[in-house]
Amino acid sequence: MVQNKFHYAITGRTAAEIVFTSADRSKEHMGLTTWKNSPDGRILKSDVNVAKNYLSQKQIAQLERTVSGYFDYIEDLIERENTFTMEEFSESINEFLSFRRYDILKGKGKISNAAATKKAHAEYKEFNKTQKIVSDFDREIKQLKAKNT
C-alpha cells in the first residue's frame, strides 16, 4: 500500500495499474523503459511485473526524490522519539504527499496485483517468442571481430 501511494502520487496510477496498462507485447521492449539486463540484455518474465520498469526517467527521478524526502521526514520524527501505529504511518504518507501537492490515492486502486501480473505474463509469453536471442558465443565472436578491426 505504501508503494502504491507513491506510484499514484507520481503517475496517477497504482503499481498494478501501471503494469496492467503498460505491458504491451506490440511495443518496443514490451513497453518497458528499463529492465534487469537493459539496455541490450534479454527481457525476463520477472521484469514485466515491476511497475518502476515502465516509468519514464522523469517519473523515476520524481519517485526517488519523493521517497527520499519522505524517509528524511520519517527519520526526523523517529529521532525525536515519535512512535507510530500503522494507521498513523499511512496517514503521515498522505500528509507528506499532500504537503508536496501530489494527488492522494483513495482506496486500493482499480486493478489488483494478481490481474496485472496475469496480464503482464500473458503479454510476455507472446513477446518472448519474438525476442532476439544473442548467445554468449555470438557475443564473444562479435567482440573478437571488433578487436581485430
What function would you assign to each model-found segment?
Residues 1-149:
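Positively charged, phosphate-engaging catalytic surfaces used for nucleic-acid and nucleotide handling
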